[in-house]
Amino acid sequence: MGEYGVYTTDEFDKDFKKLDRSIQQQIKKEIDQLELNPYVGKPLGYPFFREKKVQGYRFYYLIYDEYVVVFVIALSDKKSQQKIINSIRHLIPFYKEEIRKKLDLP
């Protein structure tokens, strides 16, 4: 397995910027580690849909082995965890199209 490219959604970026700098640094460190092994997070119903916890926050990501890409989708606290997970599950086909666009694939 080679290094995975890591991409983020605009939604994730917006929420990430609102966090305290120290939490941002910890989350960034965890995201950087996904380049080498994206399967470290807790699976959420599918092997390619996972979450990682950092302090009181969780970030959610999708793994696309066929493109060697990790797509970091969203960030939440425990309170909104299930709502975010359900939303991502419904939008999985949309996110695949988004990553294809980011990679300039037809």
Name each region found by the language model.
Residues 1-25, 101-106:
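Arg/Lys-rich, positively charged N-terminal/basic patches that mediate binding to nucleic acids
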Residues 12, 60-61:
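GIY-YIG nuclease signature motif recognition
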Residues 1-5, 62-106:
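Enriched for short, Lys/Arg-rich terminal
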Residues 29-53, 99-106:
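A short, surface-exposed loop/turn module that caps and links secondary-structure elements
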Residues 54-58:
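Short, surface-exposed coil-to-beta transition loops
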